[in-house]
Amino acid sequence: MHARWTGRILDETFENLAENRPDIPTGTLTKLRELMNRAVPDCLVTGYETLIPALTLPDEDDRHVLAAAIRAGAQVIVTANLRDFPDAELAQFGIEAKHPDEFVMDLFHLDGVRVHQAISATAAAWRNPPGTPADVCDRLAAAGLPISAAALRR
């Protein structure tokens, strides 16, 4: 598995974060974006723009996501917005859309030890306030991943 995204996807993500979480300082969001790009080698997909006009999705504004997935050779688009990524449209490119909860559960079933290690590492990185794996699971549940959170608590 190799996470990939585009500058445009990050723009949308961080605009939504800024709008929905005004308590997070702009500088923190900027730093998080930089850390994400540094943490995942070769994460930025480019050269996908010419594919956009030929694609059909219920929401035309989501075509850039599919175009980037095609360009990256992705097998999965991880999104909570499943209705705008219909199986019939994605299947012709060998791509499927998965809800983040389903995706994390797939990872858990493939290598539960590593997923638990990632949860522990995330908790250990929290400083203010300090976190525990249970806290990370609480955040996952609150973010719409209740099945994964419950599995990781076991």
Describe the residue ranges of each PLM region:
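Acidic, PIN/NYN-like endoribonuclease modules and their adjacent C-terminal/linker elements
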Residues: 83-154
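Long, charge-dense, solvent-exposed interaction surfaces that engage phosphate-rich ligands
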Residues: 57-58, 145
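A metal-dependent, Asp-based hydrolase signature
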Residues: 26-32
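Short, basic, glycine/proline-bearing loop/turn elements
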Residues: 42-55
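Short, hinge-like loop/turn segments at secondary-structure boundaries
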Residues: 20-24, 94-97
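PIN/NYN-family metal-dependent endoribonuclease catalytic core
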Residues: 1-22
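Acidic, metal-binding active-site segment of PIN/NYN-like and related structure-specific nucleases
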Residues: 62-95
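Ligand-binding beta-strand-loop-alpha-helix segment within the catalytic cores
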Residues: 34-42
